[in-house]
Amino acid sequence: MTDAETDVSGVPEIDLTDAEVLRDPAAAYGRARELSPLARVSAPGMPAMWVLTRHEGARAMLNDPRFELGAGSYMRPAGIPEHCLAYMRTMQEMEGPEHARIRRLVSPAFTPRRAAEFRPRIEAIVETLLDELEGHARDGTADLLAHFARPLPMEVICELTGVAAADRPRWREYGAAVAAGRGQEFADAIPAIMEAAVAAVARSRSEPGDDLISDLLGVQAGQEDRPADAELVTLVWHLVLAGQTPTNLIANAVDTLLRHPAQLAALRADPGLMPRAVDELTRWDGPVLLTIPRRAREDVELHGALIRAGDLVTAALASANRDPRAIGDPDRLDLGRAPAAGHLGYGHGPHFCLGAALARAQTEVALAGLLRRFPGLALAASAPGHLPDPGTWRLASLPVTL
């Protein structure tokens, strides 16, 4: 079936390869939402999944222990060396007490207060990248994705994990490989990423500094339970993977602002709106369309349908974040919207994004720097296009005139 048609049971069926779904997923998932709180999504080569389309149902599922994340929730490239596999099992693959323990140990390094303390260092990175962006411009046009939004998160990760300046070019290459997706380039980069992460943890242990890993080693030093080096290496790996989310959030936010001149003008006139603006941009045009699928641990009845044990279940954030039952006038971009709107852009429940405060800080600093440096910033004539990815809303490029 195509975009939001229903099967004989009345549950909407969404073909993730349908051109309309790929062109405008918010609209496609939104049509399914208005038909039913529960739908099915499918694509050739992947198992069908149940999808919660409305805000209330999505929020409930993300907090329901009957649906769990695990290794099967992720697709990994083939040929990864055995010694790397132990480092690849991040918190996202853990549940229950195991997940709670790791989350408790690492959370002190990811508080809003710590993100605020790191903010001046993020600002310095942004200013350097903006200087370089001008150098990449040809006839006044530059690709903001390639030369700003993509390198920024990896530069921040290097800064926050204490990676030496001399080693950062290699880490930029790692970030580019991760951004490329699940291809051979990604698989080939994994051993080098793990080796670099092991070295970063060892350096922070022997020479503590003002960085995230040293924070974790110091905070836990006096406690019986503390993160092992292998767990810290896994955290660095997780940061490298998660860095792609701020990339897409920043690029989407710039694209959206440049297409809404009245909202852009309001933000320029009142920079104090920036925290609310970033929350609204995350809700309205966030990069996560579908959450990482969870597996039902037992038979569960949802909205009149039987979810069998082992079935995959996801939440359509693209439709939940525009659900009129939860958010007033949800299809309107309003940078002054009150944060109480309660979007799910960073997830919900035990797996709420650990780095949400850091992602917000990066995005706020990036947008503020761009708007300040380039008052005439505009989309170039060659309009950007989105990649055909039904799970992640991400641009192929972002050509702008400076």
Language model feature labels by segment:
Residues M1-L402:
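Cytochrome P450
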